[in-house]
Amino acid sequence: MLNSLHSGNRLRVDFSKTPREIEIPNLLQLQQKSYENFLMLGERDRKHSTLERVFRSAFPIHDQQNRLTLTYKNSEIIKPKYTVRECMERGLTYSVSLKMNIALTIWNRDEKTGEKLDPKEIKEQAVFVRDIPLMTERTSFVVNGVERVIVNQLHRSPGVIFKEEESTTAGHKLLYSAQIIPDRGSWLYFEYDAKDILYARINKRRKIPVTILFRALDYTKEDIVKLFYPTKEISIKDNRFLVKFDPSDFSGRAEYDVKDMDGNVIVNAGKRLTKKKAQQLIENGLEWIEYPLEMLMERHLATAVIDQESGEVLYDVVAPLDETKLKKMIEQGIESIEIINDLAEGTDKSIINAFIADNESLRLLKQTEEIDDENVLSAIRIYKVMRPGEPVTPEAAKSFLRQLFFDPERYDLTEVGRMKMNHKLGLDIPQYATVLTAEDLINTVKYLIKVKNGHGHIDDRDHLGNRRIRAIGELLGNELHNGLVKMQKAIKDKMTTISGTLDELMPHDLVNSKMITNTILEFFSSGQLSQFMDQTNPLSEVTHKRRLSALGEGGLVKERAGFEVRDVHPTHYGRICPIETPEGQNIGLINTLATYSKVNEHGFIEAPYKVVKDAQVTDEIVYITATQEEDKCIAPASTKVDENGKIVEDLIETRLNGNIELNEAKRVDLIDISPLMISGSAAALIPFLEHDDANRALMGSNMQRQAVPLLKTDAPVVGTGMEAIVSRDAWEAVKAKRAGKVEKVDAKNIYIMGEDETGVFIDHYPLEKNMRTNQNTTFTQTPIVKLGDVIEVGQVIADGANMDQGELAIGKNIMVAFMPWYGYNYEDAIIVSEKIIREDTFTSVHTYEKEVEARELKHGTEEITRDIPNIREDELLHLDESGIVQLGTYVKPGMILVGKVSPKGEIKPTPEERLLRAIFGEKAGHVVNKSLYCPASMEGVVVDIKVFTKKGYEKDARAIQAYEEEKAILDSDHHDQLLMIDREEILRIAHYLSGQELAKDVTIGDKEYKAGSKIDEETIKGVNRFALRGVVQSYSDDVQNEYEALKNYFLKQKKRLKNEHEEKLSILEKDDILPSGVTKLVKIYIATKRKLKVGDKMAGRHGNKGIVSNIVPEIDMPYMEDGRPVEIILNPLGVPSRMNIGQILEVHLGLVGMRLGEQIQEMFDNKTADFIKELRAKMIEIADVAKLMNAKEVLSQMSDEELLAYGRDWSRGVKFAAPVFEGTNQTEFDKLFELAKIESDGKMTLYDGKTGEKMIERVNVGYMYMLKLHHLVDEKVHARSTGPYSLVTQQPVGGKALFGGQRFGEMEVWALEAYGASHILKEMLTIKSDDVEGRARAYRALTKGESVPASGVPETMFVLTKELQALGLDAELYESKKEVESEDE
């Protein structure tokens, strides 16, 4: 399959070396699918949704006395009342309500036993859970009017994990441990200590010998021994100890001289027993061999030895054998004993050691508890470790242990955990068993012993098979579960405390859904994973929603996360982007999904590969997880393959279990789908990424997310082909929902008419204009289709911010030169030509929102008004009669935006007083000015005003005017749509009638038509509707019926439109819902134009960032031989040490694109006779440089009109795509340089703009894509003379937000001391800071023109003395009288 030349709504020459097999999946599908599964909004059957599952797990709820049961029937979802837009304007949460149907059963009970018999009555009732935030179409949530994103969490998968660590105490001994991690419940650890005792530990509490755990689970000592050890039977004959001859015991070297019954040595110690010899011995009839005494002395019994006389247990299981015991047995005449064979392969003494350790602890317990049964004691021991200091009964201890691991309410492994357990331990317990079983514990311990003996596999906790993703649906499900658990507790408490008759009881008396709502809202508003959406530009939004965080509840803590967790892991390949992660303390903890990766239903990340069989690449594409990838040999996408899909080379570099190895082509199982699959969506936007150092690529992908939307957008000349994909999935670009034809298009609306099985429809796409984002940037959507265009489904019909013809465009193509210029580009600074400022190349608009609310207070209501006490009239000129600033006003700091007065707390005036006041309007004395002022450092134009009034309060003129405007817009929309339907109706009818023959004669105007003839379409279109009815009478009945059917069909469509319109109007008329206590809310939107300034931060896409240091007149900039000056000068020293050479290649290719564009423009200017033919040939020649494209066919078959449109686009620069790891290579560059008539090193001669002299060296000049970042100098610069002071210390506050001062710190004090500037220093530390009296005195002196008096004691001194007094030290300040003065007197 060849790669397409199309990218968005333009052509782009793509240099890919591998064909694009599959589409990049929707970038936001993880979040969308996850939330979809949570609610299942549109589906009929919702019982598989996460929401339903959570509710079913929490019910039924019983009380302890068996009187009541609450059961959950089902739930319905109630659609939201407000649109997203309204919620954002009014500060509400865009959410659904849930109607839960709950049944309360009251039981008849048996009075004696208290058991329930039959239901006395069942009552059903609906309980509402309000405010479950609903995901908007933009994949975000609106909470309290603010758009937020829930970041996906990457956490440790439930299941079992085996680890090894170096011992901290016993030298460098390796200690092994196993952890069983549930999704919910207690963690269980098994670990070795330095003495080889195996311990269990629950929830990081004190450790207990592992045998205690098994005994508490009702295993006898003998069971435990048989589970973990093979046993040997030893016969005692003639004071000798004999054992059956088993060749498998001697698989290694023999540990002792093996003797037969007669004492002959068969195998010498330290020698091997060959299979052949063993066979021979068996044939010779060797059955018993002697077991040496010294070996027997170190063994332990596997079964109890019974005293032959008394019948009592003589020696218990696990008793160590010694001389006296053996003697005793011989004396007793015991014939055989069973011993634990801990010398067998794959065993060790750890369980025996644990038995020895547990004997100690149980012996002490026996004395205190006075219980003999050791299994009960074991349970009590566990209870005491978990709940120290609490009294305990055997029953409580048993049930406690059962609850810990075997109760589905307290413990949940989840299906994923069960799957991982079964996979690791080789069990086949069914998926739905999500609690632990005894089998799990035994097999875990067995595997741990295996690991210690070097046979099992240690797990890597950072392997992506052991980490999984919890997306929004699951996170929200967990929160809901927490809320339900709280509610369950509350319900059970209520059930027990209810006294009196139960007959009156209803479900809502018990169920309080507030707890659920609170838990969910807390998660959305203050949870660690719920973040304020980064909305600087479309890319930052898309990547924010694709982010994976290892932090958050149940995740890591960033202070404790080590290096390993943060590092790139081999399994990240094709799953997680290795480049994009923040710098700083979160590095590596916050990641991004790779472009092609998907997340499966278990939460594991999958990467796509093509299947390879016998060195033959097939068409089968599989998505596999990191675990499934183990032992698979994977070839890179760049592997050479012939046209039949056979791998050409014999030996290729492949990936196998995280290592890169050379392997034969036959060994290969899979091949990468595309080199692009490694990187994430932001890194994939960097051309020539393969030539950049990783650190710089990281900065580049992070800085692209900070690019501000500019006034005019401009797609990159050198892109990567990813631009169209990002805008395809961002909501900012408007995409057609259904196919059709553009009926009307203007700056704010696009109407597309089409027809499907339901009838003719008109899709109306309203466009956002000047919408303020979370980061105060401005989003505007611009239509890119024309009237009459035929639109396909999913086609981009309007560009969002930072988009150009359906491609992402976050910056500008600028001509740059790499050279020093009078020292102005020292330390990465950037020199900019004045032309860029003049042409508004980097001008952006930022919109700020200020709001003010009038509240109801105890002593009256605040009012928004124009008459404000003690304010001059000229300060109110820009306000309207309601006291709100007028639209279009240019506001500056300190201007009043909204006038508001608030009543002073005063005694209630008498009715007479009130009357007088009403007559004379003497209000001023009793109210205080609380107006909204324009803050410092904000100036701009008021672009929008929103006024919301609470129900029952009178709307002011401003609110009424806004309503009228909105209504007028809706009415005109409706009118337009009706006209379109009308037009379509006449077209259809005319088309139909013109094809039918007349049944009678008819006259239209002055022309007569005979029966049997046809009337042409144009004539029918010219007849008005009422006359047409008469004309139709002249056709046959069938035709008349069809005509009526068409009329009715369109009538129905018009009715539908009318209903929709009325619905919209009713929404417009409904009252504003405001938070309680607020009577009126006014929002003012101020737009500021920010031109590029000295101090603004700019960057390229390769991590090459800098600050604008100088804006130079165009005339002084260096210029080329044809007189064109460059636009930006960058420092060449920023390249070699940073190793981001990608920018140099980008500059070369950008120059080629622009030069070729100029050649095409020249063709347009000259317009020869066969101009189109030449243009087509030129475009084919350019596109043919990249081999893997369908350029020839596409361009040669394209219609002339289309070709001209695309040619016009290319005349402003031919667009190239250099995809990640597949950029333009040397031969392609050579061809392109030749086509563009550029010298082969891409450099050119420049002349100094100031002197006109030729530069000595040739300079690298070309086009680079430059971005203006969100760090604008206007928003950072800040100055204060006087302002607020901190309360306790009385020093000026800090920070721009608080209008604070600059801190004169310790080191600054040293500087003044060094200069000996004592007076200035004293002033700095007193009256300029916190000497309250001194400040006031200085102010008085300055106003009177006197000299500033001496300063007093700084407030800090008083604070210090107070703190000393609080410590109990009596510190007082005394003023000393100056002796010098007294002498003068």
UniProtKB/Swiss-Prot annotation:
GO terms for biological process: DNA-templated transcription. It catalyses: RNA(n) + a ribonucleoside 5'-triphosphate = RNA(n+1) + diphosphate. GO terms for molecular function: DNA binding; DNA-directed RNA polymerase activity; ribonucleoside binding. Signal peptide: none annotated. InterPro entries: DNA-dir_RNA_pol_bsu_ext_1_sf, DNA-dir_RNA_pol_bsu_external_1, DNA-dir_RNA_pol_su2, DNA-dir_RNAP_su2_dom, DNA-dir_RNAP_su2_hyb_sf, RNA_pol_bsu_bac, RNA_pol_bsu_CS, RNA_pol_bsu_protrusion. Keywords: DNA-directed RNA polymerase, Nucleotidyltransferase, Transcription, Transferase. One of its GO terms (cellular component) is DNA-directed RNA polymerase complex. PROSITE patterns: RNA_POL_BETA. Its EC number is 2.7.7.6. It comes from the Bacteria. NCBIfam families: PRK00405.1, rpoB. DNA-dependent RNA polymerase catalyzes the transcription of DNA into RNA using the four ribonucleoside triphosphates as substrates. The RNAP catalytic core consists of 2 alpha, 1 beta, 1 beta' and 1 omega subunit. When a sigma factor is associated with the core the holoenzyme is formed, which can initiate transcription. Belongs to the RNA polymerase beta chain family. This is DNA-directed RNA polymerase subunit beta. It comes from Sulfurovum sp. (strain NBC37-1). The gene is rpoB.
